[in-house]
């Protein structure tokens, strides 16, 4: 029987269906028009297979794909044209690479005959994206589409996830081929799931069994591996207190008794201080970023280090490891747990409380329960998380809003934090939140941003308007680039070099997009207006006029070790 002959563009549609793609975030243009023409028939009527979300800027397509991936556990997809359309996605691709987020970016490209001629909207996308993606490939023939798409999704989602780029030449889109579906199940020289070393597992278990002061660092890898239950069984059997990285905040419920708080520069006081006292440090699916370690040479100097990670490249990259267990933590954690003795470390656990009380009295109470003065970011976050019964997805932008909302938001469900961790991309929050509403349509999506980050992708209010995406937007407006301003006060003599911002009338902007809006100036109105936002169907923008010069504490200053964290800043 003869095989069906179809175009490369049609082959792309069928290949995406085979990968169970449901939502595509995109923006059409010249060199991707054949694909969008094929897409037309698959987004309506009886043949409908996909929802296409028309963003207002290609950067937003990449970030929306990230948000979708982070809350759904599936691969996010962005579809854009060549040249500036493709290069506009670079920040999102780099961000996804840093945070191990599985997305596939499909970009149009000029025809093969025009490659290398500086044709209109031509760019060497493969060359540009190779350093910031897991795999970047140019499709030059229609018959290669099914193979390339299947391979792209396999690489994006397997092992340590990440972004993949497909550069789709226009001639390959319109040329025909015999359709035959392809399912990629392995790639030569690519080993995404290393075999776990039983000797390393035994060594790790022995160190933990003999530890008097064990401490676990819970990272994004737990979420990516779906190892939430395995983590809890591991921690509870050996009675190990744990700190969570920024990206690992929802890997362990906030109310779990072994959760001691967030790690990092603006993390919890106890988790940072106790890192320097533990005798065995178990890092699970995290990469020892500089925001966690402070000065690496001074980090946990007394501890034996056990590092569990799926990516061998992370072992010994920053912190010297005593025992490395390379592999998927969904397998490595139970392998270690089976060898653990049932243990109790009550005195060690209780010792965290002294530091927690200090932070509670000097920082937390002042942040979330102020009685006078302007609104504070912490109290806004606290009211929002309580209004959602601690069950919402937190999406945030970058800056002070990111740190404060991550500190005070509470997590009871997995896959509940969407943030730009490694790359620190301002403008990430709004489009990522849009993606999250499609990736987790049954959940409440709360997006915090400052006036700086909001305006970097403010055009995506158009996407929210068109889709009626139910993003609950909380604008923390202090008329400053707050994080930079704080550093200027600390390290540059208080010279606020271009960090004060003149802002537009956000009420008028919301009105123009048909988005419900309110503003909170007096804290007496905060509770009622937050509850109104949460209960209102569809999108909502709540502007909060917060203190202009609010600082984020605790803070570990650059060049300091984690036990030099300060509860108060001295200018």
Question: What would you call each of these model-derived segments?
Answer:
Residues 29-32, 83, 100, 163, ...:
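Glycine-rich phosphate/pyrophosphate-binding beta-alpha loops
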Residues 1-347, 383, 387-390, 470-473, ...:
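N-terminal alpha/beta PP-like core and its mobile active-site loop of ThDP/TPP-dependent enzymes
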Residues 165, 307, 395, 448-449:
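Generic enzyme active-site microenvironment
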């Amino acid at each position: 029987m003869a095989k069906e002959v179809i175009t490369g563009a049609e082959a792309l549609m069928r290949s995406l269906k085979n990968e169970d793609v449901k939502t595509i975030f995109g923006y059409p243009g010249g060199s991707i028009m054949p694909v969008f023409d094929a897409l037309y028939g698959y987004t309506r009527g009886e043949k409908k297979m996909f929802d296409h979300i028309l963003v207002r800027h290609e950067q937003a397509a990449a970030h929306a794909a990230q948000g979708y991936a982070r809350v759904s556990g599936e691969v996010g997809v962005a579809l854009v044209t060549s040249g500036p359309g493709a290069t506009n996605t670079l920040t999102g691709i780099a961000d996804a690479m840093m945070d191990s987020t599985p997305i596939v970016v499909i970009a149009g490209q000029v025809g093969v005959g025009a490659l290398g001629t500086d044709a209109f909207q031509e760019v060497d996308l493969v060359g540009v994206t190779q350093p910031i993606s897991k795999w970047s490939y140019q499709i030059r023939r229609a018959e290669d589409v099914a193979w390339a798409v299947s391979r792209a999704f396999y690489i994006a989602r397997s092992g340590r996830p990440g972004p993949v780029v497909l550069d789709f030449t226009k001639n390959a889109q319109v040329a025909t081929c015999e359709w035959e579906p392809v399912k990629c199940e392995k790639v030569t020289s690519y080993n995404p799931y290393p075999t776990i070393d039983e000797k390393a597992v035994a060594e790790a278990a022995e160190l933990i069994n003999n530890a008097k002061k064990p401490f676990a660092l819970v990272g994004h890898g737990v979420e990516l591996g779906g190892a939430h239950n395995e983590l809890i069984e591991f921690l509870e059997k050996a009675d190990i207190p744990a700190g969570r990285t920024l990206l690992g905040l929802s890997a362990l419920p906030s109310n779990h008794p072994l959760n001691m708080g967030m790690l990092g520069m603006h993390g919890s006081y106890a988790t940072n201080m106790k890192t320097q006292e533990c005798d065995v440090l178990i890092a699970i699916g995290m990469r020892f970023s500089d925001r966690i370690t402070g000065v690496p040479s001074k980090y946990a100097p007394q501890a034996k280090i056990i590092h569990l990670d799926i990516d061998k490249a992370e072992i010994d990259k920053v912190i010297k490891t005593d025992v490395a267990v390379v592999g998927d933590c969904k397998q490595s954690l139970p392998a270690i747990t089976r060898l653990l003795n049932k243990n109790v470390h009550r005195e060690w656990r209780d010792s965290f409380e002294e530091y927690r009380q200090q932070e509670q009295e000097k920082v937390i109470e002042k942040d979330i329960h102020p009685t006078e003065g302007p609104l504070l970011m912490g109290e806004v976050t606290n009211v929002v998380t309580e209004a959602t019964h601690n069950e919402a997805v937190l999406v945030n932008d970058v800056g002070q809003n990111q740190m404060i909302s991550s500190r005070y938001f509470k997590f009871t469900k997995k896959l509940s934090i969407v943030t730009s961790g490694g790359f620190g991309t301002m403008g990430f929050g709004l489009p990522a939140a849009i993606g999250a509403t499609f990736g987790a349509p049954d959940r409440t999506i709360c997006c915090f941003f400052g006036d700086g980050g909001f305006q970097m992708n403010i055009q995506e209010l158009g996407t929210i308007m068109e889709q009626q995406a139910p993003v609950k937007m909380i604008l923390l407006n202090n008329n400053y680039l707050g994080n930079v301003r704080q550093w200027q006060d600390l390290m540059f003599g208080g010279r606020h070099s271009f960090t004060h911002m003149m802002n537009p009338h956000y009420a008028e902007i919301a009105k123009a997009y048909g988005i419900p809006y309110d503003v909170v100036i007096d804290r007496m109105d905060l509770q009622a207006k937050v509850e109104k936002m949460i209960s209102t169907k569809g999108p909502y923008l709540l502007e909060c006029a917060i203190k202009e010069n609010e600082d984020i504490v605790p803070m570990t200053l650059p060049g300091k070790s984690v036990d030099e964290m300060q509860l108060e800043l001295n200018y």
